[in-house]
Amino acid sequence: MALETIYKTKNESGRYSCGDIGVTTEEWYGLLCYDKAEPYIDTLLAFMREPQHCGTCSAMAQKYNTPAQHYNAKVTNFAKWVQKRLGRFRVIGTDGNDTFWAIVMQEGWDTKQGFKWQLRDELVDALRIYLMKDLIERFRNGKPFNGYDEAYKWQLIDDTENVSSIEIVKKIIGKNIIDNMRVDSVLKMLCESK
């Protein structure tokens, strides 16, 4: 199958775009789920977190204390991988050469801070789905209560049998049953003042 050639253009206001490249939110999400996409996720999320999902490599570099070239390379390599993985289009820049940022970004323009790019809406939606599903999976597979299992609760029942209320409170201190940072000091004070 012949590759579709998509052209990046520059409009009168100086914005570069190649329009819709035909990659849906579902396709972007599917691409993000591949192991090969993992090295690029944090960079894409950095752009996603910016207002209107726009940013320059230099602004990202300052904000996240990473070289600007890091963002340039990550976006370029992700776009090359997407183009190769989908195998149905290539994007030609205004200079007549292959270009890649326009695959991931819906438009870009020159600013005093550097060239600013905006992530594609479909990719932003796919990243949101990815984050939501990743979070659900982490909770599903992770240990409850920040790594604590609940066996200690059953041990507490055994430890507090036939024990006074004050002794029960002393045994609860530091056991992650309640918000320890706020409550432990109150419980200690109550135990000391009886």
Task: Enumerate the predicted regions with their spans.
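Short, low-complexity, charged amphipathic interaction modules
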Residues: 1-8, 150-194
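Short amphipathic alpha-helical interaction segments
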Residues: 68-78
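Short, Lys/Arg-enriched N-terminal segment that forms or immediately precedes the first helix
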Residues: 16-33
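Short helix-capping/hinge SLiMs at alpha-helix to coil transitions
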Residues: 48-52
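The alpha-helix within a helix-turn-helix
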Residues: 61
